[in-house]
């Protein structure tokens, strides 16, 4: 997936009100950018970190700049939570995720419970439907382990129950974690920050929900899904 251009590099000054982030660009300009990430962004919003922002000339926008990447731990980390669904849509269209290849139709944002929409519904005349939920992951604190979530994620825990309900009806259901960083070699649910979600993921897997974890290759020009990572499952409690 090509990132919007032009891009500019700068240094983070502060993030505030969740969706605003001030930076000083390398050319000296002081800007306020949209931060398209409602999460805690642990270790990725600290003053002094280098970051990359894209510029839009759309006059309807209140903020012309959008935060896309942060330089952390010697590499680039994708922090735009809108991008994982775009990455997955592109990968599905190209059959670039072997476990999810071969479906005849890919439908985004399909309602599958009273108050939920699944990210993608994959269908084929000769297969059960596949309900696919996508989560962005960019938290790392221990070696090469990627963790999700980085804060309490009650809505994400509900999605796991919705996926398990589809499996009970005879469908296939997949929870896909898109890891927007290049320095991780395995994945785990973050038990201490959200034990309810960690237990929910284990219970969902025991109920037949498949868990996939894919790492990305990242540059200031492009992000693409590249490599399957193992899931280090925590025992259900």
Swiss-Prot record:
<dbReference type="GO" id="GO:0003677">
    <property type="term" value="F:DNA binding"/>
</dbReference>
<dbReference type="InterPro" id="IPR005224">
    <property type="entry name" value="SfsA"/>
</dbReference>
<dbReference type="Pfam" id="PF17746">
    <property type="entry name" value="SfsA_N"/>
</dbReference>
<comment type="similarity">
    <text>Belongs to the SfsA family.</text>
</comment>
<dbReference type="InterPro" id="IPR040452">
    <property type="entry name" value="SfsA_C"/>
</dbReference>
<protein>
    <recommendedName>
        <fullName>Sugar fermentation stimulation protein homolog</fullName>
    </recommendedName>
</protein>
<dbReference type="Pfam" id="PF03749">
    <property type="entry name" value="SfsA"/>
</dbReference>
<dbReference type="InterPro" id="IPR041465">
    <property type="entry name" value="SfsA_N"/>
</dbReference>
